[in-house]
């Protein structure tokens, strides 16, 4: 409901100047709020000089906690499911999972082109999680990642779906949307609802470029309704619902009749 209202107000041009950032395509890399004086977290203090010290302290504490607890938020969902094979992901990863080097890479995302070599290097790793974050870092650079075109094109053939999807977003962002959207469109055919959801999220991110996938999106929506009606598919129902919502919103948007009642 909150997102619906934000979209409605944004479409009407009624968001205030300190609120319109909520509808931006990306969020700030760092965020810090005074929740006592700003309970709705509208005034980001992260870049103000007087708050830099506390910002760095909180960041260090957060990263230390993520390393100590082996935070699996750094691992794509598909990877967790595949590796744990129905067991508890934490049990699967807790033994040899070291989040620190991944966290160091992730922290570079959104912080400028000076980190492009780190993303390119990660994209060539034998570890798909590194490749994923390398591609995600290049996607965040937009046109500034154009020098990585050949590397990204080869990554479109990566054996791991979530790596292909991240590379697809990056290739779209440097001006080659047809190739990227083709990969994402195929992702909607996946037998894994996790992959379908991820592909739909990236299609949302590439916006108007997703028009190449309109026919496939309409087919996917019909199939997702069937999953929602199948009582034996209870585990995937929520993912199917979110995927369908993404695609229905995107189809409406691409057809020029954005549905402001969509989540």
Q: What is each of the regions a protein language model found here?
A:
Residues 1-47, 53-56, 66, 82:
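C-terminal, low-complexity/hydrophilic appendages and adjacent surface loops
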Residues 22, 28-42, 69-71, 90-110, ...:
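C-terminal substrate/ligand-recognition segments
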Residues 24, 56, 64-68, 77-122:
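Extracellular/periplasmic ectodomains of large secreted or surface enzymes and adhesion receptors
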Residues 48, 61-69, 209:
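Structured segments of extracytoplasmic/periplasmic soluble domains
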Residues 62, 66, 221-225, 258:
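Sec/Tat-exported extracytoplasmic proteins
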Residues 95-112, 121, 129-144, 154, ...:
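Structural detector for internal amphipathic alpha-helices that build alpha-solenoid repeat scaffolds
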Residues 112-124, 144-157, 177-189, 209-222, ...:
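Amphipathic alpha-helical scaffolding segments comprising HEAT/armadillo-like alpha-solenoid repeats
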């Amino acid at each position: 409901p909150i997102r619906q209202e934000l979209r409605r107000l944004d479409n009407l041009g009624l968001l205030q100047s300190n609120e319109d950032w909520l509808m931006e395509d990306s969020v700030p890399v760092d965020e810090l709020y005074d929740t006592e004086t700003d309970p709705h977290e509208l005034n980001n203090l992260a870049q103000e000089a007087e708050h830099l010290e506390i910002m760095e302290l909180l960041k260090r504490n957060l990263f230390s906690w993520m390393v100590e607890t082996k935070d699996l938020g750094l691992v794509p969902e598909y990877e967790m499911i595949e590796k744990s094979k129905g067991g508890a992901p934490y049990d699967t990863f807790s033994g040899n999972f070291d989040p620190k080097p991944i966290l160091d890479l992730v922290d570079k995302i959104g912080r400028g082109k000076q980190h492009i070599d780190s993303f390119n290097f990660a994209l060539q790793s034998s570890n798909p999680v590194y490749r994923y974050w390398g591609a995600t870092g290049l996607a965040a650079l937009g046109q500034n990642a154009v020098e990585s075109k050949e590397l990204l094109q080869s990554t479109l053939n990566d054996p791991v779906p979530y790596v292909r999807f991240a590379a697809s977003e990056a290739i779209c962002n440097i001006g080659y949307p047809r190739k990227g959207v083709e990969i994402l469109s195929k992702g909607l055919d996946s037998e894994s609802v996790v992959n379908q959801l991820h592909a739909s999220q990236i299609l949302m991110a590439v916006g108007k470029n997703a028009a190449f996938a309109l026919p496939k999106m309409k087919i996917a929506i019909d199939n997702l309704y069937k999953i929602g009606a199948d009582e034996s598919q209870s585990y995937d129902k929520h993912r199917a619902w979110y995927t369908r919502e993404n695609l229905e919103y995107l189809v409406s948007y691409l057809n020029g009749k954005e549905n402001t009642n969509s989540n």
